Amino acid sequence: MAKFASIITLIFAALVLFAAFDAPAMVEAQKLCEKPSGTWSGVCGNSNACKNQCINLEGAKHGSCNYVFPAHKCICYVPC
């Protein structure tokens, strides 16, 4: 019985050691800030078109139509 416990302990220790070295490196996420699109005109009804315009014309990371009183506006997400 003691030999079985030793083997189980050794296997468990090996798994813990393997998991410690195999953990993926965490990359710090870049914070994004909202900025109203400078090139979009009118009410925003198509988030995909807004996203493409933000990325291609304004160099943003992302874009979407968001409700900003009193209407939906194209909002670009740029690095802070």
From Swiss-Prot:
Signal peptide: 1-29
Family matches, as CDD domains: Knot1
Protein name per its UniProtKB record: Defensin-like protein 16
Function: Confers broad-spectrum resistance to pathogens. Has antifungal activity in vitro.
PTM-bearing positions, type Pyrrolidone carboxylic acid: 30
Family membership noted in the UniProt record: Belongs to the DEFL family.
Pfam families noted in UniProt: Gamma-thionin
Family matches, as InterPro entries: Defensin_plant, Scorpion_toxin-like, Scorpion_toxin-like_sf
Entry's induction text: By pathogens, methyl jasmonate and ethylene. Up-regulated by ORA59/ERF094.
Keywords: Antimicrobial, Disulfide bond, Fungicide, Plant defense, Pyrrolidone carboxylic acid, Secreted, Signal
Gene Ontology terms: cellular component: extracellular region
Superkingdom, taxonomy of origin: Eukaryota
Gene: PDF1.2A
Tissue: Predominantly expressed in leaves.
Organism: Arabidopsis thaliana (Mouse-ear cress)
Lineage of producing organism: Eukaryota, Viridiplantae, Streptophyta, Embryophyta, Tracheophyta
Disulphide bond pairs: 33-80, 44-65, 50-74, 54-76
GO biological process: defense response; defense response to fungus; jasmonic acid and ethylene-dependent systemic resistance; killing of cells of another organism; response to ethylene; response to insect; response to jasmonic acid
Subcellular location: Secreted
Major localization listed first in the record, in broad terms: secreted
